[in-house]
Amino acid sequence: MKLTCVLIVAVLILTACQVIAADEAEATNRAIKRGWFGEESSCWWCTGFNKCCEAAAVCQSVNSACP
């Protein structure tokens, strides 16, 4: 019984670590696309529920189409 509990806890911890690592990787990819690491980007400041339309150099709602 103790071994089962230990295994369940270990699986939960490993799953949580994978989720955290995936979130960090996704955030890093978004940051690179937005130019936070030295890359030139016209809308590095575009955050939240907004998206960057590089061609028009505008930051607008994710629900709007890029011009």
From Swiss-Prot:
Q: Which residues form the signal peptide?
A: 1-22
**What compartments host this protein?**
Secreted
In which family does this protein belong, per the annotation?
Answer: Belongs to the conotoxin O1 superfamily.
Q: Which cysteines are joined by disulfide bonds?
A: 43-53, 46-59, 52-66
Q: Which GO terms describe its molecular function?
A: toxin activity
Q: Does the UniProt entry include the keyword Glycosyltransferase?
A: no
Where does the protein principally reside?
A: secreted
Free-text function comment from the UniProt entry: Probable neurotoxin.
Q: What is this protein called?
A: Conotoxin Cal6.35
Tissue and organ distribution:
Expressed by the venom duct.
Ordered alphabetically, the record's keywords are: Disulfide bond, Knottin, Neurotoxin, Secreted, Signal, Toxin
Record's Gene Ontology CC terms?
extracellular region
Q: Which domain of life is it from?
A: Eukaryota
| UniProt comment concerning the protein's domains | The cysteine framework is VI/VII (C-C-CC-C-C).
